[in-house]
Amino acid sequence: MSAQNNLKQWEDHITGEFVTKDVEQSLATMVEDASVMHMPTRSGGKGKAELRAYYRDMFIPSIPAEWQHTMTNRIVTENTIVEEAKARLHHTKQMEWFLPGVPPTNKWIDVELVIVIEFRDGKMATERIYWDQAAVLRQIGKL
């Protein structure tokens, strides 16, 4: 598929996660055996059934109301998107996918992300999200 199609799939996916908070909207952008992995915490899943539960029960409900995501660089090809972004969030909710076992600290966290998305048949096949967990832990006083 085209780079333009891949970008549209990615934008629809993150809109489902962060704007409309619609699990099915995000899943519609993915192949049946898609995988998602937040690498520092090994949180995510494989296959739409597992990802549906992950997004519904863990990821989407834990996104704080005060979450800002700013894309700083993006490379889009026919097979892959690599995105660099900055996130700023107010840690007011339990976020097992981001800070496992850490109750809300009410602190602001700034984190740089690298997201790698691979596509197959015009849909997202893999999504890997990387960040510096030590930098996050320092900001909340855990390191």
Where are the predicted features?
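C-terminal and inter-domain tail/linker signature
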Residues: 1-143
